[in-house]
């Protein structure tokens, strides 16, 4: 716009000169014409420079405050940025046209960050994602992960998980908005150089569309501010990040739901979703598909005191079985489906110096309770690796969790994840029906903060679990892990800032392995590993 104004002014200044030159053309020689044109050009250049200086003074934003060295005459020694100069703090943007009665500049200052956000909002498209990848080697051949869900992730994971989300706004008028959302997730193998999907050596390379739905605002008169969605989408997940499993997880093949519905002091999330399961027979060789539906209800963000909020949640899963499916269960050895539920509460406390801690209490029965009893990963699934089986007899399990991070002074930060669980008369995937279990797992991750970009610390993990089967036989599983690490970061938070690059050395030992019989390479019960890993989200 500024350049067009300069060009227009130049044309206006040249126009009368051109007219005068035309009227005198017949009486002037060529030399005289050139002399007049050169004089007019010098005058025009002088006028343009004067106009440019005035405009520069008038519209330079007050928020831009960079120190510029000057010479003895007071002129800037280098008033124009070079290719190596830092990017400006702000840009000039033209405001909407002012009325005749309004005064002031038609330009205003906007930071580059705000300008970038404005452009993104105007386009209505966003691309978000997550992935991790890295290299590692171990003392007994290829490095192996063990009990990540109990001992912690640092120096104990060798997968290349990713999530990629595409979101496009397709309508935003009259207080109504519609967005299309697609998410892909999966894993890229970290063992072989080839990672073709479908050529799934070692079960490493896979991908799925985990989300494909439409979300809206403003279409429900009783909840205009809420997000109303339809399609393949589950309820929001809540993760214990250090242990890499979820306390709240409701997957979906398809569903309908409402999120962030303001009711009273808090907000309601509600989802009705379909998630069919493969019901197996007792040989675990034959299966049948059973249609199941889940209702997930949460009342969240309930204020308690300063920086503290409460959530109350409930989930119920039921089957819609055909007559032939029930007949297979009654007469052909297929496991009976049993409805399952989970309910609980969680409290989140944020701290004045940064950081937070989340405490949760959850109770479940039947197949969800069975997953409470898993030491490796304990997300509240209704199946085991996608397979529904087991004699579920109404047994229950309880889980108490704590996770978070806290700053200690200016140079120390500590993250934690502590879980205590027990269950009675549940089906255990290791010890069978009518099992009892009790477990505790604890991981602490203290670190020294050198600066915003560097931390050095240690992750210490320990767990122990005992199962008792129907005959009162006891089975124990336990182990510990020590990981020394140094991380390159972009902020000091351990749990909420990424990207992060870590260098680690890990010693991990299985003290007891009566539940899974796990061993590391060379049939050893321990492993020393070193490596580097990158983790990023955007």
Curated annotation (Swiss-Prot):
Gene Ontology annotations of biological process type:
monoatomic ion transport; polysaccharide transport
- Where is the stretch described as Disordered? 52-82
Instruction: Print the keywords alphabetically.
Output: Cell outer membrane, Ion transport, Membrane, Porin, Signal, Transmembrane, Transmembrane beta strand, Transport
Q: Which residues form the signal peptide?
A: 1-25
Q: What highest taxon heads this organism's lineage?
A: Bacteria
MF term (GO), any? carbohydrate transmembrane transporter activity
Recorded topology in the membrane: Multi-pass membrane protein
Q: Name one Pfam family in it.
A: LamB
* UniProt xrefs under InterPro entries: G_neg_Bact_CarbUptk_Porin (IPR050286), LamB-type_porin_N_dom (IPR021570), Porin_LamB (IPR003192), Porin_LamB_sf (IPR036998)
Annotated Gene Ontology cellular component terms: cell outer membrane; pore complex
Q: What SUPFAM superfamilies does the record point to?
A: Porins (SSF56935)
Q: Where is the composition biased (Polar residues)?
A: 62-73
Q: Where in the cell is it found?
A: Cell outer membrane
- Function description: May be a sugar porin with a broad carbohydrate specificity.
**Family (UniProt):** Belongs to the porin LamB (TC 1.B.3) family.
**Protein name as it appears in the record:** Putative outer membrane porin BglH
């Amino acid at each position: 716009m500024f350049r067009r104004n300069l060009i227009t002014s130049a044309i206006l200044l040249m126009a009368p000169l051109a007219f005068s030159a035309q009227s005198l053309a017949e009486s002037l020689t060529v030399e005289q014409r050139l002399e007049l044109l050169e004089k007019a050009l010098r005058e025009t250049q002088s006028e343009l420079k004067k106009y440019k200086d005035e405009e520069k003074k008038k519209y330079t934003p007050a928020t831009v405050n960079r120190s510029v060295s000057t010479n003895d005459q007071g002129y800037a020694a280098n008033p124009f940025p070079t290719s190596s100069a830092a990017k400006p703090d702000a840009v000039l943007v033209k405001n909407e046209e002012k009325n005749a009665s309004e005064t002031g500049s038609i330009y205003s200052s906007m930071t580059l960050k705000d300008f970038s956000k404005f452009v993104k909002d105007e386009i209505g498209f966003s691309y978000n994602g997550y992935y991790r990848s890295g290299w590692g080697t171990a003392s007994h051949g290829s490095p192996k992960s063990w009990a990540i869900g109990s001992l912690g992730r640092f120096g104990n994971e060798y997968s290349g998980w990713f999530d990629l989300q595409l979101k496009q706004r397709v309508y935003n008028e009259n207080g109504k908005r519609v967005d299309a959302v697609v998410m892909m997730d999966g894993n890229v193998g970290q063992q072989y150089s080839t990672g073709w999907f479908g050529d799934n050596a070692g079960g490493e390379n896979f991908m799925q569309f985990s989300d494909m739905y439409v979300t809206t605002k403003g279409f429900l008169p009783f909840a205009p501010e809420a997000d109303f969605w339809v399609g393949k989408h589950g309820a929001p997940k809540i993760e214990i990040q250090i242990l890499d499993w979820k306390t709240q997880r409701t997957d979906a093949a398809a569903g309908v739901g409402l999120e962030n519905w303001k009711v009273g002091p808090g907000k309601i999330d509600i989802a009705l979703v379909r998630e069919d399961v493969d019901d197996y027979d007792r040989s675990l060789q034959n299966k049948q598909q059973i249609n199941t539906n889940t209702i997930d209800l949460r009342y969240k963000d309930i204020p308690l005191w300063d920086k503290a909020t409460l959530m109350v949640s409930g989930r119920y899963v039921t089957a819609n079985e055909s007559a032939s499916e029930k007949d297979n269960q009654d007469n052909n050895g297929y496991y009976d489906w049993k409805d399952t539920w989970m309910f609980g509460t969680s409290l989140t406390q944020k701290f004045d110096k940064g950081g937070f801690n989340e405490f949760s209490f959850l109770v479940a029965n039947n197949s969800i309770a069975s997953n409470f009893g898993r030491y490796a990963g304990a997300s509240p699934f209704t199946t085991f690796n996608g397979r529904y089986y087991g004699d579920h007899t109404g047994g229950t399990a309880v889980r108490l969790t704590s996770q978070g991070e806290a700053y200690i002074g200016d140079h120390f930060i500590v993250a934690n994840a502590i879980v205590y669980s027990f269950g009675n008369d549940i089906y255990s995937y290791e010890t069978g029906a009518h099992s009892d279990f009790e477990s505790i797992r604890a991981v602490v991750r203290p670190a020294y903060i050198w600066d915003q970009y560097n931390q050095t610390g240690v992750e210490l993990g320990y767990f122990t679990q005992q199962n008792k089967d129907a005959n009162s036989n006891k089975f124990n599983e336990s182990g510990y892990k020590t990981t020394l690490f140094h991380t390159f970061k972009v902020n000091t938070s351990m749990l909420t800032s990424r990207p992060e690059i870590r260098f680690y050395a890990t010693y991990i030992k299985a003290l007891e392995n009566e539940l899974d019989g796990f061993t590391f390479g060379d049939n050893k019960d321990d492993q020393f590993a070193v490596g580097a890993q990158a983790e990023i989200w955007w």
